[in-house]
């Protein structure tokens, strides 16, 4: 991880206030983001963007192009990762490692909630930054147990 971060730090820059037009263009060009967020919840997304969502972008220092984005919500001193995305070029250049490391090093954030992963490779990636598995309780009931509902 240290070697990858050293390389990424020399090739990438962190941008927190990417221009609105450039951000829209970048996010709209992502098929996954388009299908999961914009097609179903565009009005909610843009409203949240103005109030609660935070973004980190990994920018190529030579071309000034965004290679990755890390979307999160910050509440108090806790950051909740919502949508980490890396382009193919960003993957080659460790852009997500660069962004997560920047988030972890942010003094205004004490806890980063990686929002878990059932995919081992992703869970292992997050573990490099100190993520630990957290078990959560769930409650499930059948309506037949509650005949008056």
Range-by-range predicted roles:
Residues 52-147:
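Aromatic (often tryptophan-rich) hydrophobic motifs at membrane interfaces
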């Amino acid at each position: 991880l240290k070697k990858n971060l050293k390389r990424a730090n020399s090739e990438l820059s962190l941008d927190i206030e990417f221009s609105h037009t450039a951000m829209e263009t970048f996010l709209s060009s992502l098929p996954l983001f388009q299908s999961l967020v914009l097609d179903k919840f565009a009005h909610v997304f843009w409203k949240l963007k103005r109030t609660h969502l935070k973004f980190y972008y990994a920018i190529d220092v030579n071309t000034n192009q965004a290679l990755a984005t890390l979307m999160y919500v910050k509440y108090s001193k806790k950051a909740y990762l919502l949508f980490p995305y890396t382009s193919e070029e960003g993957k080659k250049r460790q852009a997500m490692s660069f962004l997560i490391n920047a988030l972890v090093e942010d003094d205004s954030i004490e806890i980063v909630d990686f929002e878990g992963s059932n995919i081992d490779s992703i869970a292992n990636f997050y573990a490099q930054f100190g993520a630990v598995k957290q078990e959560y309780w769930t409650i499930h009931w059948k309506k037949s147990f509650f005949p008056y509902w």
